Amino acid sequence: MARHGDTRSPSPVGSTYSSSRRNRRDDDRYERSRRDDGRSYRRSRSPERRYRERERDRDRDAFRRRDRSLDRRDEDSYRPGRRERSRDRRRSRERDDYRRRSRDRDYRSRREDSRDRARRRTDDSADLKYKSRRDDSRDRAKDAPRSRETSKPSTPAATAAPTEDEKRAERLAKLEAWKQKQAAEKERKQREAAAAGGARSILEEIDRKSGLSPAVSSPQSPATPGVDATPGTYTGKFDPKAIAKSASSTPAPPAVLGNDVAVPPSVKPVTTIPSQVKPKSTTSASATLKAKGNVGGFGLGTKQAADTEKSTATKTLGFGEEESTRRKLERLPTPPLEDAKDVNGTADGAADEDEDDVDMQDGGTEEEAAAAARAAAERREERLQSEAIKAQSNGAESNDTVMGDAPSQEAADNMEVDAQEEEEIDPLDAFMSELAESAPPKKKVGAKFSRTKEQQPEALFGDEHDIDMTAVGDGDADDFLAIANKAKKKKDIPAVDHKKVEYETFRKKFYTEPSDLAQMSDEEAASLRLELDGIKVRGVDVPKPVQKWSQCGLGVQTLDVIDKLGYEKTTSIQAQAIPAIMSGRDVIGVAKTGSGKTIAFLIPMFRHIKDQRPLDNMEGPVGLIMTPTRELATQIHKDCKPFLKALNLRAVCAYGGAPIKDQIADLKRGAEIIVCTPGRMIDLLAANAGRVTNLRRVTYVVLDEADRMFDMGFEPQVMKIMANIRPDRQTVLFSATFPRNMEALARKTLTKPIEIVVGGKSVVAPEITQIVEVRNDDQKFVRLLELLGNLYSSDENEDARALIFVDRQEAADALLRELMRKGYPCMSIHGGKDQIDRDSTIEDFKAGIFPVLIATSVAARGLDVKQLKLVVNYDAPNHLEDYVHRAGRTGRAGNTGTAVTFLTEDQERYSVDIAKALKQSGQKVPEPVQKLVDAFLEKVKAGKEKASASGFGGKGLERLDQERDAARMRERRTYKTGEEGEDEEEKEEKNEQAEERFNKAISSVQSTAAPSLPGVPKGIDLDGKITVHKTEKDPNSTSKNPLDKVGSAVADIHARLSRAGVMRSGVPIDNRGPDAGAFHATLEINDFPQKARWAVTNRTNVAKILEATGTSITTKGSFYPTGKVPGPGENPKLYILVEGETELAVTNAMRELMRLLKEGTIAAADSDARAPVGGRYNVV
């Protein structure tokens, strides 16, 4: 029946609802006419009728409230409507109701009865009244665990059938025999325990301290003669662990010894717990079998006292309370597995008996459980007696006091811990409860549950805890190191041994020379190349240039896309490069800006990819295109898209600044082409231990703007990627500029390349009008406004664009603010902005949303903007290649454009490259610019200036490697580790001699008036000759007494020995005076930059020099600002005094100090030059 307090909470862990669901459902379906018929199957001792009527009234009241809100509030009910309808049908006693079931009826019986059962269990826990057959069939499976948990003594029903009386008499006879046997065994064990009196006293003392009684009485056996025991009312709660054991489908969890049978603690008459009195601590039957021996059973190692009869108290340990369970470290006594089988089998069998046998159902189930428990107790007692004897013998041999199992101490037997039962103890509960226990006298190492030796819980959990902590600590240390090493190697791409990898064969050559080109002679081919903007080729077996798209050997889909894009004829670079690439050759293509280089390498790539098999799952790309800038990568990817759809190919654009997760997702879906920047490609190859993508399928590699890719800023990353690609790949390099030094690096990655140059290397296109003006800084902005005004004054230039280049990010933002104030809508782009802002700005500029764009050199390469008619170099480019690429943003694809460059008077260095570009493109050099060029060349001849090298000269990884190698070699020379061989020493000496000769030659050419390094004070030559002075002592100042000389020498030796190798913070490195050494030298450092002064005065560098040379280095004087001269009587300017015993030692120390000064000065100059920029890019 439904009851109050019903919830939707699942059944407790181990409850009997799960195990007896099938039986309860059967009862619901087939016994509806019986469960509410009002017949009583309970024993006459209970006030059943009054209880039953009261319960029915309450249950009916629960279903009268039909309002959903009231039910939800009062009963936590979710379906009161269904419950009421099903309740109405349930009151019907006709059997026809069962046959005329609706879907709601079945739903009610399955869904709502589960909540009714939970409510009934809550109500029945207080008085355990026997109900109708429906309630009993549902609660029958709970009887067995309840009998193990409660302290209720049970007797056979007085109204049992004659067969039941015979069974009961037989069981009573067996029980009497068993009790006599127990009494004899108890007397024997008490005699054996006489020798353990001292241990008993200790145990009793511990029990008193921990609040335990020396003996705890046990409830009377239900079969004790002469006692008419009545079933006591159960007022406790169910133990979830005991319920779980009975609900398990397999008999693995052992059952509790005795179920409803309590073993008497002694031969004396025992007291019976009356059913009317509620115990102070609600316990189970197994818990009431508690005696002090079970405390010793967990490790105190003492035998139980023989005088347990002293205490007649009925105090029990409250194992029914969850709090008590945590407070006392006790284990529930359980029988072996075979006993559990008997008990569970009895309970399950009773649940499955004939449903018509209602009268004897309850009594039969209870008595069978009791009989099975008694039989199990007999079998267990025999086994425990033999084990106790063995335990005593083992304890005598190991000098351990073993607890004896006397008949009166059956609770101690029940608390015996079996090896098979280890999993039943919760380690956390045991450890926490032990905190409240008194500490044992000593710990036992290697604690282990066994039947023969009782071990202490502290030893068990303490040892396990220590062992686990040690193991975890060691493992964690290793894990942390592994994680740290893994983080260091995060971006390392392992080198691939191509000899061990089997690559698929692929075809490179797709080009077949047309017949009309094959008939052309070499002279005709040379004249054709001359007509095509003067194509220059270098290499073996160079194909003749094509004149139309149909001669390139392309597919129909590709030709259709070319027609749709409006490419009527090939450009010069396309006419020569496409046949060369389609022939399978490596190509270096150099052509002017805006000449169609992108299409020249894309079209052969599509043909190359379509010839190979499709990509399988998790295979990498076939074509790889690397670019130096993110904007160029997005532009190439955009140029690919028209062909990708027609050819059913996929491409991924991977560059830094964008979320890598999106790029990883695109690569995992599969892509034949990847357009990337080198840094992000390395990230993708190293991501997820190389599982994101790989380069095994790559057979076609393109390096766009190749001269920048092989500059020091990119060359290490590019070479790392190229080393992981198969050696027989086809590699194509394209750029508008290609210095000679970059060309030498690029040829290392190519195999017999064909070099194609259209119009010359590093040449501005002739369609571009170049204007170079020399102006002061305050005049440049006014001139810029004039240029923009002239551009947009005519209507034909209404849609024109203007691109303004500056050298620094701060300058770009400042110029943006000024132009916005003047009314020009503009935007800025530089490396300091987020990538999404850079992309959106480029797109808006191309779309004409704003006509003016201010940019650093990140927008100088590859940017293709239609209607771009004006390029202004607001800050002059610092080398030729940058100027060519900046000017090449206009005048593209045959259109005309204008490039204006501003120079200032102090930018003589940059004027040389600009004048060279003007001459190569056939334009006249203005007079002011030529004056700047001549003035700079005169300074170079005089040694006042150094001619700048062509190219970017970025600071890549090679510089870091070189610095590390130099530092390692210095340490080897300093500390003489012995790792270097004689050959290395000879090489080092030769290199040093060569450097000295080179330095002497340079110093003889350089002018002493103008130092070669910025920041070096005048009059100081760091590469000049080092002057060492010999310290002269006044002969009159020394004592003529020989003893004084000996004493001073000894003191000096002791001082040096005690000071050698000692470095303490706050103490000067060496404070010897000018007379400490025979030689000394000075080096003034007052006017050097702060970084240079720090390099020669910090303790780390000075300590290295001291160890290497054995000299004394002292900083003297005072620091004076630049231009201030110390007056008479003041300290001299800051200088370093180096003293040593030999001239060579002082010279070596001075040379090392001067080297540090030189490096510090160079570093200061570099930082000053880079400080205003604040971005990643120097000039791109």
Curated annotation (Swiss-Prot):
Pfam families: DEAD, Helicase_C, KH_12. Residues 272-287, 391-401 have a biased composition (Polar residues). Residues 578-756 form the Helicase ATP-binding domain. Gene3D superfamilies: P-loop containing nucleotide triphosphate hydrolases. Residues 24-151, 164-192, 376-385, 956-979 have a biased composition (Basic and acidic residues). Residues 350-369 have a biased composition (Acidic residues). ATP binds at residues 591-598. It is an enzyme of class 3 (hydrolase). Residues 783-933 form the Helicase C-terminal domain. Its EC number is 3.6.4.13. GO terms for biological process: mRNA processing; RNA splicing. A motif (DEAD box) lies at residues 704-707. A motif (Q motif) lies at residues 547-575. GO terms for cellular component: nucleus. Residues 1-421, 947-996 are annotated as: Disordered. It catalyses: ATP + H2O = ADP + phosphate + H(+). Its main location: nucleus. It is found in: Nucleus. One of its GO terms (molecular function) is ATP binding. Keywords: ATP-binding, Helicase, Hydrolase, mRNA processing, mRNA splicing, Nucleotide-binding, Nucleus. Residues 8-20, 152-162, 241-250 have a biased composition (Low complexity). ATP-dependent RNA helicase involved spliceosome assembly and in nuclear splicing. Catalyzes an ATP-dependent conformational change of U2 snRNP. Bridges U1 and U2 snRNPs and enables stable U2 snRNP association with intron RNA. The Q motif is unique to and characteristic of the DEAD box family of RNA helicases and controls ATP binding and hydrolysis. Belongs to the DEAD box helicase family. DDX46/PRP5 subfamily. This is Pre-mRNA-processing ATP-dependent RNA helicase prp5. It comes from Aspergillus niger (strain ATCC MYA-4892 / CBS 513.88 / FGSC A1513).
